[in-house]
Amino acid sequence: MPHSWDYDAVVIGSGPGGEGAAMGLVKQGARVAVIERYHNVGGGCTHWGTIPSKALRHAVSRIIEFNQNPLYSDHSRLLRSSFADILNHADNVINQQTRMRQGFYERNHCEILQGNAHFIDEHTLALECHDGTVETLTAEKFVIACGSRPYHPNDVDFSHPRIYDSDSILSLHHEPRHVIIYGAGVIGCEYASIFRGMDVKVDLINTRDRLLAFLDQEMSDSLSYHFWNSGVVIRHNEEYEKIEGCDDGVIMHLKSGKKLKADCLLYANGRTGNTDSLALENIGLETDSRGQLKVNSMYQTALPHVYAVGDVIGYPSLASAAYDQGRIAAQALVKGEATAHLIEDIPTGIYTIPEISSVGKTEQQLTAMKVPYEVGRAQFKHLARAQIVGMNVGTLKILFHRETKEILGIHCFGERAAEIIHIGQAIMEQKGGGNTIEYFVNTTFNYPTMAEAYRVAALNGLNRLF
């Protein structure tokens, strides 16, 4: 690379996508700077998204587990905790993650610059530092990895102390007895689980006709049933007409004529790319209505020397995928092409209580494609390990081709689902005939384990063949 620039590459954002790109670039010998607008590295994933929400979920699920354990079932021993106490646990995890990720940059001699960046021209950025000074820096190439933020419609007053988004909910200082969650996507469903697990009444407003419609329908139905059974009120096919903040809570008027009142509102309906402050018009780049950029298979934007990864390019909007996208973009940026690519079947983990995880095709997709598939199921309640630890709620479902025995999709509902799914994913990725459901029958599992669900499900499915 020419050395007339301050840097070979500048990465805007230090979340998973920015970290993947920066580490990939420095490992290839590039001079790299990472710009982070906040005081700590890690991006939204570490500070407002994945890490704190999963830490909250874990704490709440352990409380539920304790209170449902027959050994501690008398009411004098019930474990309770305030939202503030649980947030302290999340803060501890965030601090550990921040220190660890800061160490990655320091060990790899990757410069971190703090402040807000915007483009002056195609190779120059202005950096507004926290002390008010403005610096300019130049680079041959750029990676935009500035992430996303919760979508704020203009007619919702997010300055009201009882109206929250998925970022500000982590600053909740009172103890709500009743919460309305608007938006039943992944974030809305995860927080519905968290609040209900703390004995808070939950109204979950879904703008569609079923929860998480991208999931296999059995998984979606399982979550709906579990919510219903735990007391979450789900209202499908509803949209708000007006949201009023009052002294003691929030009133939501729905277009159907209904009215709801609760102590607070969590608005969790969509996200927007953090591109509006980058002055992309100065370099001729345009975003869509949600602030997202279009890229090619190597994550190049319409400007070949400007790349974009992570939430800012939309689907799949997963921290795991963003890191890989950054790594692939770094390879393309230095070498002109990328030999690595995102895997075709990206696993999804949804951290409701219980968890949901999937990889591959759903039953609905295979039916529409007219693929002759069969189903193998294992119920957690039939596994010795689940009985020992009290994880009786859950199921593992394997979809496989009737003739070739190739695994086409795996879907899991239950505690540790996001871990369990990777066993099946590893077999699905095997080439040359290695992807076969018969593997689970012909191998030996530790006993007792949750992994044994694969053997049970495989036998169940193969026994259906004739």
UniProtKB/Swiss-Prot annotation:
GO terms for molecular function: dihydrolipoyl dehydrogenase (NADH) activity; flavin adenine dinucleotide binding; NAD(P)+ transhydrogenase (Si-specific) activity. One of its GO terms (biological process) is 2-oxoglutarate metabolic process. One of its GO terms (cellular component) is cytosol. It catalyses: NAD(+) + NADPH = NADH + NADP(+). Its EC number is 1.6.1.1. InterPro entries: Class-I_Pyr_Nuc-Dis_Oxidored, FAD/NAD-bd_sf, FAD/NAD-binding_dom, FAD/NAD-linked_Rdtase_dimer_sf, Pyr_nuc-diS_OxRdtase, Pyr_nucl-diS_OxRdtase_dimer, STH_gammaproteobact. Keywords: Cytoplasm, FAD, Flavoprotein, NAD, NADP, Oxidoreductase. FAD binds at residues 36-45. Pfam families: Pyr_redox_2 (PF07992), Pyr_redox_dim (PF02852). Its cofactor is FAD. Binds 1 FAD per subunit. It is found in: Cytoplasm. Conversion of NADPH, generated by peripheral catabolic pathways, to NADH, which can enter the respiratory chain for energy generation. PANTHER family: DISULFIDE OXIDOREDUCTASE, SOLUBLE PYRIDINE NUCLEOTIDE TRANSHYDROGENASE. Homooligomer; probable homooctamer. Belongs to the class-I pyridine nucleotide-disulfide oxidoreductase family. This is Soluble pyridine nucleotide transhydrogenase. It comes from Salmonella typhimurium (strain LT2 / SGSC1412 / ATCC 700720). The lineage of its organism: Bacteria, Pseudomonadati, Pseudomonadota, Gammaproteobacteria, Enterobacterales. The gene is sthA.
